[in-house]
Amino acid sequence: MADQSSEIVNALSSEMEAVSVSSTQASSSSDGFQMSEEVEKRYKIVRSIGEECIQEEELKNLLAKKAAPICYDGFEPSGRMHIAQGVMKVINVNKMTSAGCRVKIWIADWFAQLNNKMGGDLKKIRVVGEYFQEIWKAAGMDNDKVEFLWSSEEINSKADKYWPLVMDIARKNKLPRILRCVQIMGRSETDELSAAQILYPCMQCADIFFLEADICQLGMDQRKVNVLAREYCDDIKRKNKPIILSHHMLPGLQQGQEKMSKSDPLSAIFMEDEEAEVNVKIKKAYCPPKVVKGNPCLEYIKYIILPWFDEFTVERNEEYGGNKTYKSFEDIAADYESGELHPGDLKKGLMNALNKILQPVRDHFKTDARAKNLLKQIKAYRVTR
């Protein structure tokens, strides 16, 4: 077993050297690396996804050297899908594929079981994973350029590659370092964790190398384990580290909610919500007049509506300023902060835009027998934390 673990580490250290971003290359890039027009265009598309990128120079070098980098994303099948998992994922994945990336979406069924999602029932978790794929298809994800991989199937088929890697990552890290990563599961270091949940970060770190990912495209809440993967590269003397591209996390719709909660229906828009449900949730959403910071309605517009439509339209009577179409978030924020744009008018425009985006998904789940059956099962499941 020791020999096998050593072989895995050696393979990781030497693989893809032809496209590796060495420290020398990264330095020369910052000292005057010139991207071609095509590479610069691809870079701008990919970089637009991330609230944070570690490291930008490495990303530029990667795109210059590799026509089809592998981008890794993943999810725990854990109940109904909210709009950030649905629409934002479609926006980001389609940007990656348009920039030439191969996207691998890791359906983390074993991870959901480790984290006790759906009560740890793998059959239910499987149903949820299939339901997620139906939503993305209906919402317009470029599935021809996306590879969906079930963690249980991939790990079982390549166990001799996967488990030595997990063990080596575990061996090279102290328990406090692993505990700092439990945020990736929606847990905190002070929670009473099972042994399975302590294993989870080591496995997710291993996924990155197992899938041969060049780019980790996950939310800011997954940042710590992605950084762990880069630190592991230092441990094994691997030059080409995975690039971290972390997207923004949408807040819940109620005041003070940093994240959406599947246990609080008013905190999030779900992908198959009916028009009336969307309207009620937005009407009740926190949206203080003239306040931009911490305003979830404005966040929805910035991260969902504008990327989807390239504009945001407010419909008003002439006496209140008439209809107005915005092309930039800065203009929306300025009008809102000044009081020119009223919360009621902003919410009305947001409702209209959200319902336009969600209508094809609703139609799919009403007309497609398989999708309809999956949703019926999902709604009957009890969501577990």
UniProtKB/Swiss-Prot annotation:
- Cellular component GO terms, alphabetically? cytosol
| Placement of sequence motif 'HIGH' region | 77-85
Q: What is the documented disruption phenotype for this protein?
A: No visible phenotype under normal growth conditions.
UniProtKB keywords: Aminoacyl-tRNA synthetase, ATP-binding, Cytoplasm, Ligase, Nucleotide-binding, Protein biosynthesis
Gene Ontology biological process: tRNA aminoacylation for protein translation
State if Aminoacyl-tRNA synthetase is listed as a keyword: yes
Domain of life, source organism:
Eukaryota
The UniProt annotation places L-tyrosine binding at: 200, 204, 207, 222
- Write down the EC number: 6.1.1.1
The catalytic activity, as recorded, is: tRNA(Tyr) + L-tyrosine + ATP = L-tyrosyl-tRNA(Tyr) + AMP + diphosphate + H(+)
Q: Where does ATP bind?
A: 262
Function per UniProt: Catalyzes the attachment of tyrosine to tRNA(Tyr) in a two-step reaction: tyrosine is first activated by ATP to form Tyr-AMP and then transferred to the acceptor end of tRNA(Tyr).
- PANTHER family attached to this UniProt entry: TYROSINE--TRNA LIGASE, CYTOPLASMIC, TYROSINE-TRNA LIGASE
The name this protein carries in UniProt is Tyrosine--tRNA ligase 1, cytoplasmic
Q: Which organism is it from?
A: Arabidopsis thaliana (Mouse-ear cress)
